Amino acid sequence: DTGKTIWEYKFNIFQSDVPPHRVAWASPAADPETGNVYALGAGATVIALSGDGKPLWQRSIGEEFAAFTTHGGRTMSPIIDGDLVIVSAAVSNWGTQAARSHRIIALNKRTGDIVYVSNPGGRPYDTAYAAPHIATINGTRLLIVGLGDGGIHAIKPQTGEKVWSFVAAKRAINTGVVVRGSTVIISHG
């Protein structure tokens, strides 16, 4: 009722190309079941905080998957589905994960352990910061999101299994989708 800050949690950004006036584009996600808050920072670090702002765990997607957020810290908002907190990032790694891609990464919301890594799209042209959306369409629960390859992709949020993709643009999709019944509405400009 007062507008006063209840708590604040600050953490370091270890990427030198992120200017201080553009420090990430994602909103945190609050979990109504646990009261916890999840954030994906400009350095591609996922942080879990209790409802009173105490750190529970953190995971560096930037270090583990070579995720990059580019100038300005373009990151997607995390989304919660059941026991998962799901994030996404453009990556370019070594070995079996060397191919540049835009991966969707699901973590156990209580422990931060990786549950799955999904790669539903093609090679990204840009990083993307579209908000993911979860909807049930024709009886199937889907996570639908625009990625850096210019496509809108639908996966099963509990398994990461790709259901469908639609290439909508030549560059990243940076707007969230709207779902009405069984219709997915996208915009890009």
What are these regions, as identified by a protein language model?
Residues 1-189:
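Noncatalytic, solvent-exposed loop/strand surfaces
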